[in-house]
Amino acid sequence: MNNLRVRFAPSPTGAIHIGNIRTALFNYLFSRSEGATFVLRIEDTDLERSSKEFEELIFKELEWLGIEWDEGPDKPGPYGPYRQSERLEIYHKFAQKLIEEKKAYRCYCTPEELEEDRRKAVERGDIPRYSGRCRYLTKEQEEAFIREGRKPVIRFIIPDDEVIEFEDMIKGKITIKSDTLGGDMVIVKSDGMPTYNFAVVIDDALMKITHVIRGEDHIYNTPKQILIYKALGFEIPKFAHAPLILGPDRTKLSKRHGNTYIGQYRELGYLPEAMFNFLSLLSWSPEDNVEIMSKEEIIKKFNFRRIHSANPVFDIEKLNWMNQQYIQKSSIERIVDLAIPHLRRAGYIDGIDDMVYNWLKDVISLYKDGLQYVAQITEKAKMFFVEEVEYSDETVKILNSPNSKIVLEVVKKVIEEADEITEEYVKDLLKKLQKETKVKGKEFFMPIRVAITGEDHGPELVKIIPLLGKDKVINRLKKAINLIK
């Protein structure tokens, strides 16, 4: 490790959005490719919405994806504590320092006064900003407000007519004027809790963070933070703002585009290495443009300079294709183990012994290479777990085609007389019955397939019939025969 330090600082207020996970991933890849220290910090100052359950979920999702951190709440380091709720005294100390140096002040404005100021600014056609009403209060005025029961916030003084410039590692030079920042900003709320822009500067400075890598939705926070860095005499880190991920309609990725939380993909049976691979390619690509890469290969090839500024599109079809490649390369045992919870939730299985497990391996192996995500198995392999299959209008037409009844009755009779149904037995049987009935090809196979599966396509009959078992096959053949007019 060298002196480079990066951090991922989520709030434990809900499930982790895909965009936040991509931010964590870029910080992780930077740390591992550059030999930097990767810090996990929990920003839990929103006491009402923060919870330990969501904090545990953050750990779980990062670990599932294979993102390891070097310092954090569970991995003490030299710059802890790593939860903001445990650092309140530190923030108060620096807020007081700013007040003493006349760089911040207590503000007693009521919400009604602030709303009235905002309304008047809008009426004038101005950008709403704090008026600075409390910047120069006398001691007597402050005491009067306190007697009224007003609880102050602490505001940081935003200088007038200052130009803040910084070199973004992804977007290049960014220039923002101080008069667009909304006026003197609140850094400590009336309940004593620090605001995001204040706490994040204190934490990043004291934790020696050298590179702040985050989403571009933070760009307008950066000049405010730079002003606080300067006011406190802290060294300013390098900033990188990754482009936001868009949905297929090129608007910001949201719930209307489908699943937007990493946990939803984990629960559906997407593989962590596929998600790691896919997310790494949202705004970054290796020089050789290879798409399927292991975690180790991505780390080896990762170069921060190859992150581009254009907004990437979250292409679910691309993710499904990529996940399918990883499923195909996985062992059947791994996919069965991932499928079992889905099959249980569907009510298809209960207890599992070695015989059932081996049967599941045989069933799932029929579909494994075609799965885009593991949860699809409950629908694709449904016919193996239900007693009866349903027939659509289209499949009923197939059952009513010429010779169907003859074929189904002959197959039923022979299977009823069989002692054991194996793949070899079924293969020989179907070959023999085509000769006996003089019905061949699709005209022979399709009625059988539809009768026992309810579908007009799928895995080979010679594999399906032994796995379904004699009783199910006979019952379905009987039902189909009775449907034929």
UniProtKB/Swiss-Prot annotation:
Q: Name one GO biological process term.
A: glutamyl-tRNA aminoacylation
Motif 'HIGH' region: which ranges?
10-20
Record: residues binding ATP: K255
Q: Which organism is it from?
A: Thermoanaerobacter sp. (strain X514)
Q: Which residues form the signal peptide?
A: none
User: Chief subcellular site?
Assistant: cytoplasm
What is the name of the protein in this document?
A: Glutamate--tRNA ligase 1
Q: What is the lineage of its organism?
A: Bacteria, Bacillati, Bacillota, Clostridia, Thermoanaerobacterales
Q: Which family does it belong to?
A: Belongs to the class-I aminoacyl-tRNA synthetase family. Glutamate--tRNA ligase type 1 subfamily.
Q: Which PROSITE patterns match?
A: AA_TRNA_LIGASE_I
> InterPro entries annotated for this entry?
aa-tRNA-synth_I_cd-bd, aa-tRNA-synth_I_codon-bd_sub2, aa-tRNA-synth_I_CS, aa_tRNA-synth_I_cd-bd_sf, Glu-tRNA-ligase_bac/mito, Glu/Gln-tRNA-synth, Glu/Gln-tRNA-synth_Ib_cat-dom, GluQ/Sye
Q: What does this protein do?
A: Catalyzes the attachment of glutamate to tRNA(Glu) in a two-step reaction: glutamate is first activated by ATP to form Glu-AMP and then transferred to the acceptor end of tRNA(Glu).
Per the Swiss-Prot or TrEMBL record, what residue ranges does the short sequence motif 'KMSKS' region cover? 252-256
Reaction catalysed by this enzyme: tRNA(Glu) + L-glutamate + ATP = L-glutamyl-tRNA(Glu) + AMP + diphosphate
Which terms in the Gene Ontology molecular function aspect does this entry carry? Answer: ATP binding; glutamate-tRNA ligase activity; tRNA binding; zinc ion binding
Subcellular location field: Cytoplasm
User: What does the record give as EC number?
Assistant: 6.1.1.17
Q: Name one GO cellular component term.
A: cytosol
Give the record's subunit note.
Answer: Monomer.
If you read the UniProt record, what top EC class would you report for this enzyme, in one word?
Answer: ligase
Query: Known Pfam families for this protein?
Result: Anticodon_2, tRNA-synt_1c
NCBIfam families reported in the protein's UniProt record:
gltX_bact
Which keywords belong to this entry?
A: Aminoacyl-tRNA synthetase, ATP-binding, Cytoplasm, Ligase, Nucleotide-binding, Protein biosynthesis
